Amino acid sequence: MHSKSPAVAALKAAFPHTIPIFAGFFFLGMTYGVYMRTSGFSFWYPMIMSVVIFGGSLEFVATSMLLAPFAPVQVFLTAVMIQARHLFYGISMLDKYKGTGWKKPYLIYAMCDETFSVNYTAEIPEGADRGWFYFFVSLLDEFYWFLGATLGGILGGLLRFNTEGLDFVMTAMFVVIFMDQWLKEKHHFSAWIGLIASVACLLLFGADNFLIPTMICILVALTALRKPVEAKTQEAVK
């Protein structure tokens, strides 16, 4: 009797780890799709953006960016700041992703908070190829988000309901993300950096001009304090 291929064994091992992620990604993705559709975009916007960007927080923000006047510098800095934590994820995964061959570029591209957490902590069973395990965790997580965003975009055009105030979902999402990170962290290192920089720049530059200075301050602080932040990040997922 032939034994299972390493890829098939890896898929069967990876899938159970992604089931909790499906619950979150699918419904949040649907919310994003509906939000995009009610903001005036066709369903293929969230469908394509969920694959090309694959960053939930950035995709929500991108909706308002697409509706705002063209400001490439602010868009670039905003994107860098929102996704900056991935720099530390990437550094932490250098050894684990070593030797994964052609899969490595996709593993780097598809890394998100949940994928990082699973791939960093999972104990890969014997007989399952390590590279394929990481690949299927990443692929399944992205598929869940893609599926939710696409269905949300389609349903958002079919359903007729009062969407007034739906744009507040983005504000609520960032508040929930901040609170979740605050509760998970013991040191609140990065949270304090963000709070102090935001309040200081708001007072110095005013509500209309504080965003870019805040992002620059946070980026500089996180870069300068990379080693302690990276160490705390690794402790949080162990």
List PLM regions with ranges.
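Short, Lys/Arg-rich, polar N-terminal cytosolic tail immediately upstream
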Residues: 1-13
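Helix-loop-helix junctions within the multi-pass membrane cores of secondary transporters/permeases
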Residues: 2-3, 76-167
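Helical membrane-embedded segments and adjacent short helical loop/helix-boundary regions
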Residues: 11-28, 41-47, 52-55, 160, ...
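Alpha-helical transmembrane segments of multipass membrane proteins
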Residues: 30-34, 61, 118, 150, ...
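Alpha-helical transmembrane segments and their membrane-interface exit regions
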Residues: 57, 81-88, 173-179, 198-200, ...
